[in-house]
Amino acid sequence: MSHSNHFDVIVIGSGPGGEGAAMGLTKAGLNVAIIEKESSVGGGCTHWGTIPSKALRHAVSRIIEFNSNPLFCQNNKSIHSTFSNILGHAKSVIDKQTRLRQGFYDRNQCTLVFGTARFIDTHTISVMQSDGTEEHYSADKFVIATGSRPYQPDNVDFMHERVYDSDSILSLKHDPQHIIIYGAGVIGCEYASIFRGLGVKTDLINTRDRLLSFLDNETSDALSYHFWNSGVVIRNDETFEKIEGTDDGVIIHLESGKKMRADCLLYANGRTGNTDKLNLGAVGLEADSRGQVSVNSNYQTSVEHVYAVGDVIGYPSLASAAYDQGRFVAQAVVKGEAERHLIEDIPTGIYTIPEISSVGKTEQELTAAKVPYEVGRSSFKHLARAQIAGKDIGSLKILFHRETKEILGIHVFGERAAEIIHIGQAIMEQKGEANTIEYFVNTTFNYPTMAEAYRVAALNGLNRLF
């Protein structure tokens, strides 16, 4: 092996976690290589996950907005599009993101190697390139940031042309009139919004008793209602017995005895870590049944010189958190210990239509913990900015301690929820008495804005105290 093939650190995977680690390590002066199995950087987040699905959702929401606004939609004329047509919008965003991220590596003189990596001993990896050639690289330390992929159970034929997962759905060429989505987690709910927004008949099969049960119950109920109101058929507490591909579609047989037929099926029930091809045994590691590896507070595995970040270590499995974990693992590699760690209250952003975001505790969690809390609410339909924009569906809810007035949780349902949440998050992150709902009463907001919902909700909540 040539001396040029040895690095201080090799990062496997160029998604958010790998990027954060590589940038932190190169800026600290280390000689870093990053291995990427695809032909361009960005990982699953950029190419199959966060970026394309949100670009699709944006395009669909604009179509809905146009068709529901009488100013634009006159004489009963409306615009229509298909999933395959709006994929072009997603591709343009992916290309921009890829070029941006490629520039990060170029400017920071980080060595990029394209190919599939696997360990061959404790300090060496083999990289199989697209032309079939194999190259060996060694390093003092490694960071595994290989992400995750959609879980594919053995008894589902994903080779059938009408059965998709959340990656392959982005290659959808035909235009379905009816889709079944199996799995009502975040991905399933987001795609249910997209397809229903395009006018596709949508059946959403949920393996649990309510949608997104980790959310505040009121938010979960609101999503269920809006899905129902838009025509999405939700089947709760169902498990598939058999998925049968036909010449022109798919039939799903449920254990409850029901069966349903559609033009295609999107299987969106779980994800698994991308570790099966790494040959972890060669370095003394073993992944669990979900393809994930365990790490300590410094993102260090049981093998001292091997670290891991992102989806491959499990919760919270968010692109934003993975990038932060990458920065923190760079600190751990350089200084022996991570100087910072993920914040306790990580915000959740769910890009359904309407959008959802939350941070902190839910009402059911506070009730179970016997915390004396109060609720402040603001309805978007009463906000001037929402009325102007025609986005008056939604609300903001603040949960706060009755005695200390400390903000305990914030839950937003409606347009721009994932943006609005960060105003409240910033106050929640303040220490001691600085975290108080009274901030929203004592500050001055721009008018008209969606942010004004915080002032309205704060006044509503404080007026409940006695």
From Swiss-Prot:
- Protein location: Cytoplasm
Per the record, the GO terms for biological process are: 2-oxoglutarate metabolic process; NADP metabolic process
Q: Which SUPFAM superfamilies match?
A: FAD/NAD(P)-binding domain, FAD/NAD-linked reductases, dimerisation (C-terminal) domain
Principal EC category: oxidoreductase
Where does this protein hold FAD?
Answer: E36, K37, E38, S39, S40, V41, G42, G43, G44, C45
What HAMAP family has UniProt attached to this entry? SthA
Q: Which gene encodes it?
A: sthA
According to the UniProt record, one GO cellular component term is: cytosol
Species of origin reads: Vibrio atlanticus (strain LGP32)
Provide the cofactor note recorded for this chain's UniProt entry: Binds 1 FAD per subunit.
Annotated protein name in UniProt: Soluble pyridine nucleotide transhydrogenase
